C-alpha cells in the first residue's frame, strides 16, 4: 500500500517551544464571523513579518468543522506557487459572493409557500453549487498536500462513527488521503440542509475505501479537542517532529479557538414548548431545526468546557483563547439565511467581537465571564500574534543551527 506521508514546509515543534493550534467552529453562513477575526489575526502577523505572512505559516494544526472545514481548506491548500490559495482577508468576500448561491433564498410566490413539505421530501438545498465550487477551487489537491497539518471531523452514517481526516493519520491510514474537496463537502453536509456525501478512494494496491459522510458538527462542532488529541497521539507514538513533548503536556500548547456565535441567551426552546413536539416539530420549528441546534450547541459547549478545564488545571489559561458570542438572536443566528443584509450584519458582528472583552468559561457554572484583566479580543490577538511570530523565528533559528551542526559533523567524519 502506498504511504503518502504529509510533507509540510513549516519547522516542527521539535525546533521550538510550543505546539500551535487554530480551531474553527461550524456554523454555515456564520463562518463570516470567523473570517473577520482571522483577517485581523493575519494582518497582525503581516505587520510583524511582512505582507507574505499567512496563517498556515504559524500553526502546526488548523482544524475546522463544517464551514470551519471549508475555511481550513482555503487557508492551507496551495496555489500554483506553493503558497496558500487564499489569504485570510479573502474569506469574507468569498462568503459574500458564494453564500447566496450555496443557500439560495426563495423569492416571489415561492417565498410564501410553507417550507415544511420541502423538508419532508428531501434536503433543503441540493448542494450542487457547493460541490461544483469546491471541486473547481480545490481541484485534485489531496490531504497530504496541504501546507500545514489539518484536522477535519466528519461522521460516516454507514459505519455510525466519526471519520476524522487528519494529516497525521495518513502515517497509519493512507486510505484517508482523499481529495480535500471531498472532505469539505462531507463535513458541510448538514442533515436536513444538504444530502450526505458519498465517494470512494482507491490506493495504489487497488484497495477501495468507501465514505458516506454527513456534517462533522454532529461529531464535534468545535474541533479544538479533536486537534489536541491528534497532536497528543503523535507525542505518544514518539513522532520526532514533537521533540521532547510529553503526552499530556498541554501547557506547551497554544490554542486559538474561534466560534461562529450561538443563541444560548435567546432561549429559543423550553421544556414547556417542546412537551408536545413529535418527530416533525423536532425537525422544524419556525425556520429552525431544533434537534440539529441542540446537537451542535451541546457539542461546541462541552468541548469548550473540557478545554477550559484542561488549561486551568495546568495554570495555562493564557495559552487558550476562545473567541465567541452567545448573544445572537433572530436572523443572524440562522445557519443558512444568505441575504445581503444578513451577511453584512454577520460581518459587523465579527467586527464587534474583536472589540469585546476576552471571556473565559467559569468551569463551575459553565457561564462565560470576562477575564480579570480588562483586555479585548483584538488586544489579545495582537499578543498571540507576537508569540506566534517569535515561535516561528525560534524554530527557524534552531533548525538552521541543527543543520549547521549536522554539516560540521559530516565534515569531521570525512
Swiss-Prot record:
The modification Phosphoserine is found at residue 399. InterPro entries: Acyl_Trfase/lysoPLipase, PNPLA_dom. Gene3D superfamilies: Cytosolic phospholipase A2 catalytic domain. The keyword Nucleotide-binding does not apply. GO terms for molecular function: monoacylglycerol lipase activity; phospholipase activity. Disruption phenotype: Decreased number of lateral roots. Optimum pH is 7.0. Its main location: cytoplasm. One of its GO terms (biological process) is lateral root formation. It is an enzyme of class 3 (hydrolase). A motif (DGA/G) lies at residues 215-217. Keywords: Cytoplasm, Hydrolase, Lipid degradation, Lipid metabolism, Phosphoprotein, Plant defense. GO terms for cellular component: cytoplasm. The nitrogen atoms of the two glycine residues in the GGXR motif define the oxyanion hole, and stabilize the oxyanion that forms during the nucleophilic attack by the catalytic serine during substrate cleavage. Belongs to the patatin family. Possesses non-specific lipolytic acyl hydrolase (LAH) activity. Catalyzes the hydrolysis of the neutral lipids monogalactosyldiacylglycerol (MGDG), digalactosyldiacylglycerol (DGDG) and phosphatidylglycerol (PG), and less efficiently the polar lipids phosphatidylcholine (PC) and phosphatidylinositol (PI), but not the storage lipid triacylglycerol (TAG). May play a role in root development. This is Patatin-like protein 1. The lineage of its organism: Eukaryota, Viridiplantae, Streptophyta, Embryophyta, Tracheophyta. The gene is PLP1.
